[in-house]
């Protein structure tokens, strides 16, 4: 067998292994009993966000805004993922989560606009804020949460969690 043939053979095996690993990702699941008040009708989103910013500053976290509605299956799928054993600690240790109710796209649209949440593709839509309220990232990548995996959510949270505090110099 020529060197080129061996190389192509090894590349084919490697590509197959990667494809197999990708195929095994398990899609997120809807909860058995969706929370009918996940996005509270009576919530004051502006006040909730302000409280989250104060808590985030005090706890050295970021704020994760989750724009959605109680009618939205993908919103419940994503929230269910947030409670899974591999995801919950990552979320809770690094973010203050605020659910922002957009109703039937008729509530809190000013807040969605302020935080650059693009609702045109659907919900859930997420925005990551610094503890000072700066929009670090805004995405509509979760509007089809049912096709995402736990690994996708973990990768997103890992990417946007706050940086580890700088190590203080050793005292002499």
Model-predicted regions and their roles:
Residues 69-82:
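Conserved redox-active cysteine motifs that mediate thiol-disulfide chemistry
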Residues 59-72:
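Short active-site neighborhood of thiol/selenol oxidoreductases, capturing the structured segment around
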Residues 23-59:
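N-terminal leader/targeting and pre-domain segments
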Residues 80, 87-109:
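Thiol-based oxidoreductase modules, predominantly thioredoxin-like and allied folds used
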Residues 121-165:
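Non-catalytic, surface beta->alpha helical segment in thiol-disulfide oxidoreductase systems
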Residues 8-17:
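Bacterial N-terminal signal peptides
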Residues 1-8:
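Bacterial N-terminal signal peptides that target proteins for export
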Residues 106-123:
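Structural alpha/beta surface segment adjacent to cysteine/selenocysteine redox centers
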């Amino acid at each position: 067998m020529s060197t080129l043939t061996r190389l192509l053979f090894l590349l084919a095996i490697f590509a197959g292994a990667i494809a197999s690993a990708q195929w095994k990702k398990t899609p997120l699941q809807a909860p058995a009993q969706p929370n009918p008040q996940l996005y509270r009708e009576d919530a004051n989103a502006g006040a909730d966000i302000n409280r989250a910013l104060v808590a985030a500053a005090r706890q050295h976290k970021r704020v994760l805004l989750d724009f959605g509605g109680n009618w939205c299956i993908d919103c419940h799928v994503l929230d269910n993922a947030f409670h899974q054993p591999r995801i919950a600690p990552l979320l809770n240790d690094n973010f203050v989560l605020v659910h922002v109710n957009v109703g039937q796209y008729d509530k809190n649209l000013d807040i969605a606009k302020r935080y650059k949440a693009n609702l045109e593709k659907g919900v859930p839509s997420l925005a990551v804020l610094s503890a000072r309220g700066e929009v670090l990232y805004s995405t509509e990548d979760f509007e089809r949460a049912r096709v995402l995996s736990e690994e996708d959510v973990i990768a997103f949270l890992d990417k946007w969690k706050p940086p580890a505090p700088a190590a203080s110099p050793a005292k002499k």
